[in-house]
Amino acid sequence: MDKSGSNPQVDAFIAAVDELLPGFLADPIDMAMQDGNCSLMIIEENGRVYGRMFGTDHVKQRGTCRIAWQKCTQVWMTGFATGKFEELVFSNQLDPSPFGIPHPDFIGWPGGLPGRLQDGTKLALAFSGMRGENDCEILRRAAAQVPGMSIE
């Protein structure tokens, strides 16, 4: 994989999210969350960051981008889906100290998932702007459209 340029699988994933988003936003509940202003973030294990903001309201885009960044960096640092990490920590099944994230900074909401490319590259994926379950679902559906990409 060319580390200096774009990653074709990640580009295909972003395109799949773009294609799927109107179907999700057809639900009035998800549309009302941020008026269709959503953000996608992807981080490769080496720290390369990809992303896309959707919509027209820069203030709302900035807000969803901040949440997507927080979800994505938490997955990147921990390897666990958002929500699952907190569940493990708060049930005393996982010591959070090796990850370096203070408890007040845990995101706690669904929408961040670990992924992997066929070549073994680990990814942190996050979406923000809809209900948390749909933030996750759009990531799952988009990954299913990209050959060699999986959600862990």
Task: Give the label of every model feature segment.
Residues 1-117, 121-151:
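Flexible, solvent-exposed loop/hinge segments and secondary-structure transition points
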